[in-house]
């Protein structure tokens, strides 16, 4: 890494800081909520279920009889999760993943709204009653209250709500023994001309429970999103006491809510009428989200049936990619036109390939850093040679610049001729850094949100997805943070060494300033980033130092063509001679 490279990296670090601070997604303005709203009361207690018939009729209309009953729970246990369903609403009340623990290394429930459940149908009937099926008691058609399955075995849970002899709602869940995906079927009988707008909404309400120790960091990744018309639509509820809403018409590929590492997605099997997203930030950094699909109920059909797929599980790129629904678009890999291709087609495939025979992600990161260094070696070699030539020419170039300071056109002409004869590019030192910028940003996004690194340790780092802290202060130091991480310190040392052995065209004052400022800047920047990212750049710098020693031993300033040195000397001498003759 030459001095121009150092300057380039400093600029990159500054850009990344500014990006993190100011380039967050646009927040949606608050809009009137014209959709049917769910009941805001908590789970109805036994006393409320016995409310007077007149009150229930006023609230639920023709659904009044279904507003009372006894709740029955069903547990489905497959290889990947344990899910609890409730007959009250035919909803999902709990999802506990088996292969993923929380930040305390304990099992955790992804469903945040345990009392009322997360999944429901929402509609406005012709009586003007806003109905959320979580307030209604379905009949459990299936007999088994506990179903355990594995492999390709299938389990089915059926619910039915008989409203009157002409109207009914059927909901069916189908589970596979080894998949996060759940098939979900809705059948509405006798609802033609019974719903306002001839539509209903399938919604996931409450977002997802947080799982990480750093709630503030997790809130930065929590959002509600939809894939609509080939584009990602999302809302991020970043401000307290403000409700964010987004409502659009059109055919959706999915709607979803996510936290840092997990997602709950509703994927329609037929055409949708549109989507609705809502979010608000509560206390303790928790952000509550709602995502719904709008489905049509034709007025000419007595029976309206829709099939959906539910995905409730990890945001693992390879796993969600198999759904073939573009759900991977909800994963933030930066700019679609620049960093995302590097993440999807370089970093993640290489990591997946190496993980096939290397189980330790720390070793995978080290090998990946070595591979990148080998790939960029030709650029580094060319850059160093160019810088050494520039260093040899520098004394004469400075004198030439001084002599032609009043004639910029002549100066550029002479410099261009000298550079050409010397075979150097004054910007050649920056080329390796510039070409690595997309990869650098892509690594930042992948390491920040990749579940592959989560709870995988290396050396003293217990978790490569968070900083490798060895000491927590209990208070935060501005810019630096509230802890001491080791990888950034070691990386700062390697940056210092690398600068000491790298050729430079800078003045002594510039060199001394960058020699100390840049390592400190990198230390401050990386102290709060994932340990995996710090390990990558530490090892990349170690390999760079070794490479620089090798390049220094195999190149010299003698590579500068004699003609270039003579041209530079002649240009300076010519200017001096002209200056003397004028006197």
From Swiss-Prot:
Family statement drawn from the similarity comment of this UniProt entry: Belongs to the OXA1/ALB3/YidC family. Type 1 subfamily.
Subcellular location: Cell inner membrane
Domain of life: Bacteria
GO cellular component terms attached to this protein's record: plasma membrane
Quaternary context: Interacts with the Sec translocase complex via SecD. Specifically interacts with transmembrane segments of nascent integral membrane proteins during membrane integration.
One Pfam match: 60KD_IMP
Keywords: Cell inner membrane, Cell membrane, Chaperone, Membrane, Protein transport, Transmembrane, Transmembrane helix, Transport
Biological function: Required for the insertion and/or proper folding and/or complex formation of integral membrane proteins into the membrane. Involved in integration of membrane proteins that insert both dependently and independently of the Sec translocase complex, as well as at least some lipoproteins. Aids folding of multispanning membrane proteins.
Disordered: region residues: 28-50
Compositional bias of kind Polar residues: 37-46
Topological category with respect to the lipid bilayer: Multi-pass membrane protein
GO biological process terms held by the UniProt record: protein insertion into membrane; protein transport
An annotated Gene Ontology molecular function: membrane insertase activity
Transmembrane segments: 5-25, 341-361, 362-382, 427-447, 477-497, 515-535
Keyword Membrane on entry: yes
Gene: yidC
Protein name: Membrane protein insertase YidC
């Amino acid at each position: 890494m030459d001095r121009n490279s150092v300057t380039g990296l400093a600029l990159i670090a500054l850009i990344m800081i500014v990006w993190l601070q100011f380039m967050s997604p646009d927040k949606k303005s608050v809009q009137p909520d014209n959709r049917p709203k769910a009941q805001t009361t908590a789970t109805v207690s036994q006393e409320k279920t016995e409310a007077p018939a007149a009150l229930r009729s006023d609230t639920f209309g023709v659904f009044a009889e279904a507003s009372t009953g006894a709740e029955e729970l069903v547990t489905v246990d497959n290889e990947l999760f344990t899910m609890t369903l409730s007959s009250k609403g035919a909803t999902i009340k709990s999802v506990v993943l088996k292969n993923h623990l929380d930040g305390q290394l304990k099992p955790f429930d992804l469903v945040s709204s345990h009392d009322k459940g997360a999944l429901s149908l929402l509609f406005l009937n012709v009586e003007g009653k806003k109905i959320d099926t979580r307030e209604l008691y379905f009949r459990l058609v299936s007999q088994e209250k506990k179903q355990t399955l594995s492999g390709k075995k299938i389990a089915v849970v059926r619910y039915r709500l008989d409203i009157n002899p002409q109207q009914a709602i059927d909901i069916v869940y189908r589970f596979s023994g080894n998949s996060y995906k759940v098939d979900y079927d809705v059948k509405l009988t006798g609802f033609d001309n019974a719903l306002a707008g001839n539509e209903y909404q399938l919604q996931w309400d409450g977002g997802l429970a947080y799982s990480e120790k750093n709630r503030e960091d997790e809130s930065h990744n929590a959002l509600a999103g939809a894939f609509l018309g080939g584009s990602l639509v999302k809302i991020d509820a970043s401000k307290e006491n403000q409700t964010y809403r987004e409502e659009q018409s059109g055919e959706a590929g999915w709607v979803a809510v996510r936290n840092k590492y997990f997602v709950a997605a509703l994927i329609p099997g037929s055409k949708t009428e549109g989507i609705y997203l809502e979010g608000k930030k509560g206390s303790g950094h928790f952000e509550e989200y709602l995502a719904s699909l709008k489905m049509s109920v034709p007025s000419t059909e007595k029976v309206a049936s829709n099939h959906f797929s539910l995905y409730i599980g990890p945001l693992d790129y390879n796993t969600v990619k198999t759904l073939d629904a573009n759900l991977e678009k909800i994963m933030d890999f930066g700019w679609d036109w620049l960093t995302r291709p590097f993440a999807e087609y370089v970093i993640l495939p290489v990591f997946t390939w190496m993980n096939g025979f290397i189980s330790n992600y720390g070793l995978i990161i080290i090998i990946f850093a070595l591979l990148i260094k080998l790939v960029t070696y030709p650029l580094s070699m060319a850059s160093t040679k160019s810088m050494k030539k520039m260093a040899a020419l520098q004394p004469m170039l400075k004198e030439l610049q001084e002599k032609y300071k009043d004639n910029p056109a002549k100066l550029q002409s002479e410099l261009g001729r000298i550079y050409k004869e010397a075979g150097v590019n004054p910007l050649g030192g920056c080329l390796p850094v510039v070409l690595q910028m997309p990869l650098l940003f892509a690594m930042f996004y992948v390491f920040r949100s990749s579940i592959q690194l989560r709870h995988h340790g290396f050396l003293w780092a217990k978790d490569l997805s968070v900083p490798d802290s060895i000491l927590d202060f209990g208070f935060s130091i501005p810019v630096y943070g509230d802890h001491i991480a080791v990888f950034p310190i070691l990386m700062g040392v390697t940056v210092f060494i690398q600068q000491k052995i790298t050729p430079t065209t800078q003045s002594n004052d510039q060199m001394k300033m960058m020699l100390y400022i840049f390592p400190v800047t990198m230390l401050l920047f990386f102290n709060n980033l994932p340990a995996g990212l710090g390990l990558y750049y530490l090892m990349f710098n170690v390999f760079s130092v070794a490479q620089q020693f090798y390049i220094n031993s195999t190149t010299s300033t003698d590579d500068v063509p004699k003609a270039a040195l003579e041209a530079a000397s002649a240009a300076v001498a010519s200017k001096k001679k002209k200056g003397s003759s004028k006197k």
